[in-house]
């Protein structure tokens, strides 16, 4: 995996991610202009069907499993503590409780082992890992997850946000709709919606489509989808053909509509910046139907779509280690007294010194 590393030296970082319900710890090696994933361990907090994950419960999960996951990551990597150059952690954005739990743990390791700390922007971690794994050079980035929906492109050492959700994230829309149908959260509600959607498609239900330039909105479509779910449960829901629709039809219709919105705003950004590449990152980026729809659009423009598998698109520690080590190699450090976390941390706040 090729990287643009200014200082050609062997360096190792341990990354800690815990901004939502995934606790991830990974170890990465940068050597010359290449990088190697040494370990990538993850443990997920799964809440009961019909519910979401609360910050306090998720934070408790991260505290309970941090030591176990860290030991496994070090064991898988086959390294000594002395080999590690820095400890990287997710500074934000994310849920306050889980972020704080992992920040405290990372700070403890840094003090215990005498290592320097690097606070990392969660989205920048996704982007840099995606670029490295796929080889995408100068893509428009679609960042889609449970907490974020942004269309991004790089310019002048910043990841510039060209469009975003005006209310809730697309992943949050899907997760909350899953509760309306009591869909399991194991392994993830979005994945289970994707599986159900493949069984639907007899009818495409009419749902709100809200795009404003390169911005979009998902709260209205969620409300309408929840209303249709309630009608279906009461045996009152009928499609355009007058026949009752199923939960699979609802999942299909929701996916098709929200993904069409994402494709539209991404294509608009591609035209604006003159790019023929799309890189999809974030948990929702694992969805094969989203990748397929984006691929059709990109092909019409003579372009390409890049995406990673679940090891890297779902929240993980290795992306934090990677982005943190890139920053570390430019001289960036996070002093212990400033090693806080924040629920709001814009992608374009980060100075991307490692890129030209």
UniProtKB/Swiss-Prot annotation:
GO annotations of cellular component type: chromatin; cytoplasm; EKC/KEOPS complex; nucleus
Q: Any idea which GO molecular function terms this record carries?
A: chromatin DNA binding; metal ion binding; N(6)-L-threonylcarbamoyladenine synthase activity; nucleotidase activity
Q: Which reaction does it catalyse?
A: L-threonylcarbamoyladenylate + adenosine(37) in tRNA = N(6)-L-threonylcarbamoyladenosine(37) in tRNA + AMP + H(+)
Q: How is the cofactor bound?
A: Binds 1 divalent metal cation per subunit.
Looking at the keywords, is Transport present?
no
Q: Which UniProt keywords apply?
A: Activator, Acyltransferase, Cytoplasm, Metal-binding, Nucleus, Transcription, Transcription regulation, Transferase, tRNA processing
Where is this chain primarily localised? cytoplasm
Which Enzyme Commission number(s) are on file for it? 2.3.1.234
Q: What cofactor is this protein dependent on?
A: a divalent metal cation
SUPFAM superfamilies per record: Actin-like ATPase domain
**What top-tier enzyme class does this entry carry?**
transferase
Q: Which superkingdom is the protein from? A: Eukaryota
List residues binding substrate: 143-147, 175, 190, 194, 287
Per UniProt, subunit arrangement is: Component of the EKC/KEOPS complex composed of at least BUD32, CGI121, GON7, KAE1 and PCC1; the whole complex dimerizes.
The UniProt family comment states:
Belongs to the KAE1 / TsaD family.
- Its name, as the record gives it, is tRNA N6-adenosine threonylcarbamoyltransferase
